[in-house]
């Protein structure tokens, strides 16, 4: 009887320790600078840097996102978008099942594992996708968007982006007196697309990339 009690207590102690360690692992998840880079290309890099690193694209095109004119470069299941004016990387979209993120987060990853790596987030519905959206703490204009299977919560596709995610964000960005990296391009494209007089809009001045470097 005593042995059974000791075994039971030992089992419960092990379970408690496991739960504590698991909870700590989840709590430790957080966004890092590396989460806004893929295969050596980071949001904010020059278009030329992309081409030097990845070579010739499979296809090239243009598109408008919330009134912002973009150039797009497709490399297999990866689509990289740059601003048409500034030629800076502002969006990296990962599709298919071959991509790998930090700590091997990939297609099919569960929500619990995503939380362990990136931290917890509330589900949102955006562009016909259920998703988790993570902001970079030091740069609110860089975000990681993880699109999920709506039924099971498994990871489908990924976006690393500096683009506004809604029309409201675009309008706010266009009217902002402050101009973080690439936002000047956004403002001009958006206002011109709305046929608003832009003659009084100040010229873009050299700015710091997210507060780092010159």
Set out the residue ranges of the language-model regions.
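Short, flexible domain-boundary/linker segments around small modular repeats
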Residues: 31-33, 55
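Sec-dependent signal peptide cleavage junction
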Residues: 22-29
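Second-shell loop/turn segments in exported
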Residues: 34-40, 98-105
């Amino acid at each position: 009887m005593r042995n059974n009690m000791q075994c039971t207590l030992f089992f419960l102690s092990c379970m408690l320790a496991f739960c504590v360690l698991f909870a700590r692992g989840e709590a430790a998840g957080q966004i890092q600078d590396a989460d806004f880079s893929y295969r050596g290309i980071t949001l904010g890099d020059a278009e030329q840097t992309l081409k030097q690193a990845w070579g010739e694209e499979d296809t090239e095109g243009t598109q408008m996102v919330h009134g912002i004119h973009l150039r797009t470069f497709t490399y297999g299941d990866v689509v990289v978008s740059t601003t048409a004016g500034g030629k800076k990387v502002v969006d990296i979209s990962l599709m298919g099942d071959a991509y790998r993120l930090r700590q091997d987060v990939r297609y099919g990853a569960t929500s619990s594992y995503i939380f362990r790596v990136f931290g917890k987030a509330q589900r949102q519905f955006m562009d016909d996708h259920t998703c988790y959206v993570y902001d970079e703490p030091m740069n609110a204009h860089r975000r990681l968007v993880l699109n999920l299977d709506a039924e099971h919560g498994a990871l489908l596709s990924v976006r690393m982006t500096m683009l506004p995610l809604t029309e409201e964000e675009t309008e706010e960005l266009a009217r902002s007196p402050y101009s973080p990296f690439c936002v000047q391009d956004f403002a001009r494209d958006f206002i011109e697309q709305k046929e608003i007089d832009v003659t009084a809009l100040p010229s873009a001045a050299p700015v710091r990339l997210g507060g780092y470097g010159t």
